[in-house]
Amino acid sequence: MHAMGMLHLVRHGQARFASDDYDRLSELGQRQCHALGRWYAARGQRFGAVITGTLTRHRQSLAALAEGLGALPAATEFAALNEYDSEAMLRAALAEPTLAPPGPLPAPTTPDGYRAHFRLLRQALAAWTAGTLNVPGMPAHAEWRAGIATVLEHVRTQTEGDVLLVSSGGPIASATALVVGAGGDAWVALNLRLRNSALTEFALSPRRPVLHSFNTLPHLHTPEQAHWVTYA
């Protein structure tokens, strides 16, 4: 039974979007997470447990946060907190006549290309959620979502006090949808609005978590940090 505390769900810092290796933080991504750690340190935040996915960008985000905050408990890793494979999602959508756009998908290196990329990703995620798009290398959405629910149950039954969870936009959005009881593809819209290093909080109780805040950036509040707000 969980003593009252808060689950802090942190999306990783900015990664190297549109590069050959997205699973690494950019220099700005490192600074975003370090700033969150310093914000936690300034308010005397302590965590009883730390949980992450197994991706490099999760580990790097946690390391940068810890550098700003100081000592943290050893992290427990859950593969269920890893992001869906967006490249596989797009490939599956491009092979599906009902989803594929006319002509090739432009590279997401221009504003129009960026919009086209995320428009198709949004459609692919909705179809995957509905069970109408099979994505090679990815489980069915129901199985993926069940893995996230298992992590939330672990937090409820196996941890005490405040818990830090570092993951990606998809799992955090899916966890939020689970907590507020939003079914279908509601999680997709939440996912595509989550900002890098953003904080989402669930109030923990013996029965179930309750949404306390979503997608906040309390550590990026100065005019000088306005350009630190990123989405990929």
Give residue ranges: language-model regions.
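Surface-exposed cleft-lining segments at the edges of enzyme active sites
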Residues: 129-145
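Glycine-rich phosphate-binding loop signature in dinucleotide/nucleotide-binding domains
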Residues: 43-46, 155-160
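Acidic, low-complexity terminal tails and accessory targeting/binding regions
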Residues: 1-5, 82-112, 142, 157-162, ...
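Active-site metal-binding loops of divalent metal-dependent hydrolases
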Residues: 13, 169, 215
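Conserved nucleotide-sugar donor-interacting segment of glycosyltransferase catalytic cores
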Residues: 154, 168
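Loop-to-helix element that buttresses phosphate recognition and phosphoryl-transfer chemistry
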Residues: 5-8, 13-67, 140-145
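Phosphate-coordination/substrate-recognition cap region in phosphate-metabolizing enzymes
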Residues: 37-120
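Short, basic/glycine-rich phosphate-binding loops at helix/coil junctions
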Residues: 13-17, 117-134
